[in-house]
């Protein structure tokens, strides 16, 4: 979690956007395209990661109500240009895109966009945008903090995980950090970065988006 957020440099974060958008990136393996076996498409595949990261960065796991839309528009169409090659467009039964609007108990809004296939060039996956009362942050090209400084609009880019010591920067990849975290939790009893109850909230929100799309109504949590 960024020190800029933990230190309150963004102020009150009242809007967040969770991005998981591919132009053409429909999986072609496993049971990804089978709703009966997979449970859903782009939303539970890549949308879940973007939402999980957004709630964790905000440190806000108290949703109040959810509305959403789910679409099966491009999955049955032309498979040209897909990052993973042609998919089975005759038997796909899951959504290719989904969008959720989440209102938190403190009034903050989270907008979630998830797609395997969408006619857009604005493609961002596992990215988060935050808008606060003092500053904003996005991950379009690394982490960028936008604010007003000395009467002018300003942008700063924190040097994350850089020590200034040659050979020490990024010495461990994400998989190494994750493995060490789990081993440390097992050995010492320390809590992991993401708690089971937090993961449950993510699942509740995803289910609420599907329910809202089915019923056409807002879902209270």
Model-derived features with residue positions:
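Predominantly a Rossmann-like dinucleotide-binding segment in NAD(P)-dependent oxidoreductases
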Residues: 1-92, 216
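An acidic site on a long C-lobe helix of protein kinase domains
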Residues: 12, 93-96, 195-201
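Short, surface-exposed alpha-helical recognition segments that flank or form part
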Residues: 38-45, 88, 166-174, 194-197
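A structural signal for well-ordered alpha-helical segments within the folded catalytic domains
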Residues: 44, 48-52, 173-180, 197-204
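Contiguous beta-strand/loop segments that form the cofactor/metal-binding neighborhood of enzyme cores
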Residues: 52-147, 176-191
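C-terminal helix-rich "cap/oligomerization" subdomain common to oxidoreductases
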Residues: 105-106, 139, 181-221
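C-terminal "lid/loop" region of Rossmann-like NAD(P)-dependent oxidoreductases
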Residues: 156-170
């Amino acid at each position: 979690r960024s020190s800029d957020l933990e230190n309150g440099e963004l102020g009150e974060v009242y809007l967040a956007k969770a991005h998981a958008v591919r132009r053409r990136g429909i999986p072609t393996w496993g049971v990804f395209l089978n709703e009966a076996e997979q449970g859903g498409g782009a939303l539970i595949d890549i949308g879940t990661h973007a939402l999980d990261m957004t709630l964790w960065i905000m440190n806000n796991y108290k949703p109040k109500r959810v509305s959403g839309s789910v679409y099966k528009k491009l999955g049955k169409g032309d498979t040209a240009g897909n990052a993973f090659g042609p998919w089975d467009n005759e038997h796909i039964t899951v959504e290719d895109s989904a969008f959720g609007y989440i209102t938190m108990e403190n009034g903050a809004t989270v907008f979630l966009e998830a797609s395997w296939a969408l006619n857009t060039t604005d493609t961002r996956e596992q990215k988060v945008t935050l808008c606060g009362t003092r500053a904003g942050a996005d991950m379009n090209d690394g982490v960028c903090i936008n604010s007003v400084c000395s009467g002018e609009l300003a942008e700063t880019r924190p040097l994350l995980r850089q020590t200034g010591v040659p050979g020490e920067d990024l010495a461990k990849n994400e998989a190494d950090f994750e493995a060490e975290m789990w081993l440390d939790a097992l050995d010492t009893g320390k809590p992991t970065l993401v708690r089971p109850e937090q993961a449950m909230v993510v699942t509740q929100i995803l289910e609420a988006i599907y329910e809202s799309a089915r019923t056409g109504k807002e879902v209270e949590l």
